[in-house]
Amino acid sequence: MQVVVFKVNDEQFAVEASKVQSINDMMEITKVPKSAVYIKGLINLRGNIISLLDINLLLEIEQGTLTQENIIILNLAEESVGVTVDQVDEVLEIEEDLVEKVETDKKRGYIKGVINFKDRIVTLIDIEKLIKK
């Protein structure tokens, strides 16, 4: 399985690469008045208007001191959605058995498990569950 590893406020997360359409540098965001608090706004990506979500709010992580540098565009149920992250680190090929299941409460049901990879632990998230919550 391939995963895209990214950082949010010094924590490392991963999503399955099959869900990732593209990785882009930060671009101009158009704010949407009276939208849900987790919606950062809209971006125009090669003529396509895409909703941009604040992954910090979805993951319930405080905004870090770093500027969010990247946008990950995800393909979810025939819809493209973007999430802003501090930094995209790498794309890794991992064996399924490296993913350790973790007990989580229903509130954190979007966590698929943790990847104990070399000298670090990366949280693998089910991005569809996270966005639907």
Q: Which residues are covered by each model-predicted region?
A:
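An acidic, low-aromatic, low-complexity terminal/linker signal
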Residues: 1-133
